[in-house]
Amino acid sequence: YLGGLYLPTLNDDPDYIFAATTAKRMQIIVKVPSWSPRRWSQIWQNNIVINNDDYSSDPLVQEALTTFTLFPRQDLKAGDEIIIDYQPNGNSRVLLNGDLVLEVAGSTFFNYMVNTWIGKLPPTREFRQNILGQEAVDQDQKTELLSHQVQRAGLFSGWIAVEQAVLKAEQER
């Protein structure tokens, strides 16, 4: 995937990034032709665990982390976009192609997620340095991140609608 971290000002200090007063956004653009729900879950569960020393004692954050790792109902496709954002003293949110997947109070969830990129075991050393602005980012990648157009809007809400229809049909039997 292609990833971007957006902050109000360029800053590579984790304390600044983790601060509840800092607005922040992670952008993930799927680059592989197909990313299975199973593989998505494996990668994110692993990255969350190895980059966060303690698992949150907040049950809402635990539930949000689990929801994040399990939300794809079908394969993600090249061009799908996942946004994880946080507004100061507000909520952390995850969106898939513009659809709200989850929302949880505070910055703890966002910080667990961003730590998968800037923590002790990021995807690669170069990835971490690029995310933190410590190395020049490939201009084509930067352009792709900044000009990305959502291609499969309504994907998540479609999955949920199908699940609800199936549940309703089962209840009516």
Residue ranges, per PLM feature:
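Terminal leader/tail segments of proteins
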Residues: 1-96, 100-173
